[in-house]
Each structure stands twice: as structure tokens, then as C-alpha cells.
Curated annotation (Swiss-Prot):
Zn(2+) binds at residues 308, 310, 313, 339. This is Queuine tRNA-ribosyltransferase. HAMAP family: Q_tRNA_Tgt. One of its GO terms (molecular function) is metal ion binding. Residues 251-257, 275-279 are annotated as: RNA binding. Substrate binds at residues 96-100, 150, 193, 220. Catalyzes the base-exchange of a guanine (G) residue with the queuine precursor 7-aminomethyl-7-deazaguanine (PreQ1) at position 34 (anticodon wobble position) in tRNAs with GU(N) anticodons (tRNA-Asp, -Asn, -His and -Tyr). Catalysis occurs through a double-displacement mechanism. The nucleophile active site attacks the C1' of nucleotide 34 to detach the guanine base from the RNA, forming a covalent enzyme-RNA intermediate. The proton acceptor active site deprotonates the incoming PreQ1, allowing a nucleophilic attack on the C1' of the ribose to form the product. Its cofactor is Zn(2+). It is an enzyme of class 2 (transferase).
């Protein structure tokens, strides 16, 4: 019997919250969970080298199927020996299916049973993406974890629309499984949809669990719904997911949502947030959000976060970084991106330690208080 490409090992369950501490084993090594995955859209985490990502203990990164299909082309990545060799990253990689980009970037799209017709957001060319094509591209990319091609419904959507969408996503998931040519080397995750409707999340989860994927994702959240709705959906969705397989919440990366997601049984998260906000000088610190472009930092020669031991905070001042961001210097974006990624990866280390010590609930209270999430006008990102 061949070993599955992806295997989840549960190490400990937090007695205070039920959060899970675990390890996901992949063909390119293992990573501890709960884990945050930095996003490398174009086969690079913007402005960061693979060595820097390793310095900050990134165990796995994410790359985008849609973007790499358009440029440079999955054939070129395959010829290079796969994504790991192409980008010089020897740790695990997860690729999304391209579905989210088709639904979010393309103005013109037509959903059919076969797949989605849409226009290339770069040049307007007509393109078609189907479950089979999404599998072919990801098999060429050679990621450790691949995602099934799903329909990404808008928020909000009616129950009737969402029901049709959920059933289509299930039919597409079956086709993905049939088309996946390298199951021993790449693990394919199914994506549970259903919006905010409990009956539809159950319908989606039950159908996908029957297909027996090596892991499952929760899609259709972090698309504009309030935080309390996201938490409620997680509360009724994660119990429907197999306890012996990884659970991945797609597109979530704010510190409060990472902690709240872990408390609700999620193992993996990804988001462009830390690097996207870094580019305009917004930073995550142990005491909350800091916008370094603000005039009050012009003569502030202290570090971004006195409690942070990252390269940025050990070497550069708020005043200097403010100057770099205001003059649009690339080095400034590198420094802010490094800090934000380090901050979230460090936060996940603290979350894992709190689970180990059965005190994630206490950790959440302390963190929210210090960060300012408990205040009436709490600012998020």
C-alpha cells in the first residue's frame, strides 16, 4: 500500500478551547499546525527571498495556479522541474485551483457545467478553465497540496443560488479527483462551500467527505461578511470535517481571525494581507496596528515594535522606514513585508505553544486586550 502524499498527525488538543496542535507531512517535509502560509502569487512572496522565509520559520507557502498558468505558463514550470526547483524552495507548497481569481479578477465570465469561460485580466483574451484543466496545471506545477476547482459564489447570495453552486462544486470535485494524475505525489483537497447557510455547509461537507480527499478547505469566507458570521460558520462547519485530516480556512490572515480560527479547529490559513498592507506602510505590532507613514513617526528613531526580534526591528527605525515608504523605495517595502510576515509566523508559534499548554483561551484574551481588539472602536486591517 502506497503512503498517501499528505498525512495529518494530531499531537494535542487544547483542553481549554479544543484547538488542535498537529503536523502535516508532505513529500517536501512536514510543518506544524496551526500554520499561516505566506502567499507567493507569482512563485515569489513579494520582495522576500526563500532564505528570508526560512529565517522566519515559514513551513509552507502558497502559490497561484491562475497567475502561473498565464505567466510564465505551466509548461515552462514543468520543464524547469516543477515549482520547487523553479523558485528554489525545498519546503512544502500549496497551490490554489485558480477558481477564486477567475471569479474575482475577470469582469466577463460565464459559468457552465463544463467549466468557466472568462477573459484574461491581462490582455482580454478568451480563456476557459475546467476542473480537468485546473488539475493538469497543478500536476505540472508539482505542488505538495493541490486544491479542487470550485465555484466561488458572491457574498451575499440567496439560498437557492448557493444550493446550485454547492452541488456544482461537488460535481466538479469528483471530476478533479478523476483527473488528478499524481495522487501519490500530490495531495488534493476538497473545498467546502455553502456561504452562511448551515444546511448547505452540511450538504457540501458530507458530499466531499464521501469522496475521501486527504484534506479539506473551507471556502467562501473572508469575502466581506462580518467576523461574527465567519466565526459562526466555522463553529458549525469544522465538526463536519474529518478529525484525522487537515482543515484549511482560505484567505484569512488578520491576527484576530487566525486565533479565532484555531480555537474553532482550523489547522491552516493563508492570506496576502501581511505583504499587501506592508506596501503602504501598515504594520502589525504587539500593541496593534501602526501606520508608519503618519507624521508623528518622522522623528521616531525607535523600532517598529520594541517586542519584536525580526531583522527589520533589530536594525531600522520608524523614521527611516517612514522615509523609505514615502519615497516609494523598494527596500522600505522589503522591510515592512519582512516584519509583517515575521509577526504572523511568530504569532502562530505562540498559538501552538498556548495549545500545548492548554491555555489558548487565556492567550486570546491577553492578545486581544493588548492589541486593542476588545475596544469599542477596534481598528482592524
Amino acid at each position: 500500500m502506497t503512503q498517501p502524499a499528505i498525512r495529518y498527525e494530531l499531537l494535542h488538543t487544547c483542553k481549554q478551547t479544543g484547538a488542535r496542535l498537529g503536523i502535516v507531512h508532505t513529500p517536501h517535509g512536514s510543518f506544524e499546525t496551526p500554520a499561516f502560509m505566506p502567499v507567493g502569487t507569482q512563485a515569489t512572496v513579494k520582495t522576500m527571498s526563500p532564505e528570508e522565509l526560512k529565517e522566519m520559520n515559514a513551513g509552507i507557502i502558497l502559490s497561484n495556479t491562475y497567475h502561473l498558468w498565464l505567466r510564465p505558463g505551466n509548461d515552462i514550470v514543468k520543464e524547469a522541474g516543477g515549482l520547487h526547483k523553479f523558485m528554489n524552495w525545498d519546503r512544502p507548497i500549496l497551490t490554489d485551483s485558480g477558481g477564486f481569481q477567475v471569479f474575482s479578477l475577470s469582469q466577463f465570465r460565464k459559468i457552465e457545467e463544463e467549466g468557466v469561460h472568462f477573459r484574461n485580466h491581462l490582455n482580454g483574451d478568451k480563456l476557459f478553465l475546467s476542473p480537468e484543466k485546473a488539475m493538469e496545471i497543478q500536476n505540472d506545477l508539482g505542488s505538495d497540496i493541490m486544491m479542487a476547482f470550485d465555484e466561488c459564489p458572491p457574498y451575499p447570495a440567496t439560498h437557492e443560488y448557493m444550493l446550485q453552486s454547492v452541488d456544482r462544486t461537488t460535481r466538479w470535485a469528483k471530476r478533479c479527483k478523476e483527473a488528478h494524475s499524481r495522487p501519490e505525489e500530490q495531495g488534493l483537497f476538497g473545498i467546502i462551500q455553502g456561504g452562511e447557510y448551515e444546511d448547505l455547509r452540511r450538504r457540501s461537507a458530507e458530499a466531499l467527505v464521501e469522496l475521501d480527499f486527504p484534506g479539506y478547505a473551507i471556502g467562501g469566507l473572508s469575502v466581506g461578511e462580518p467576523k461574527d458570521i465567519m466565526n459562526r460558520v466555522l463553529e458549525f462547519t469544522t465538526p463536519l470535517m474529518p478529525a484525522n485530516k487537515p482543515r484549511y480556512l482560505m484567505g484569512v490572515g488578520s491576527p484576530d481571525s487566525l486565533i479565532d480560527g484555531a480555537i474553532r479547529g482550523v489547522d491552516m490559513f493563508d492570506c496576502v494581507l501581511p505583504t499587501r498592507i506592508a506596501r503602504n506602510g501598515t504594520l502589525m505590532t504587539s500593541e496593534g496596528r501602526l501606520v508608519v507613514k503618519n507624521a508623528k513617526y518622522a522623528r521616531d528613531f525607535g523600532p517598529i515594535d520594541p517586542n519584536c526580534d525580526c531583522y527589520t526591528c533589530k536594525n531600522y527605525s520608524r523614521a527611516y522606514i517612514r522615509h523609505l515608504i514615502r519615497t516609494e523605495e523598494t527596500f522600505g517595502i522589503r522591510l515592512t513585508s519582512y516584519h509583517n510576515l515575521h509577526f504572523l509566523l511568530k504569532l502562530m508559534e505562540q498559538v501552538r505553544e498556548a495549545i500545548r499548554q492548554d491555555r489558548l483561551g487565556d492567550f486570546r484574551e491577553e492578545f486581544f486586550e493588548k492589541y486593542g481588539f476588545n475596544g469599542p472602536n477596534a481598528k482592524n486591517f
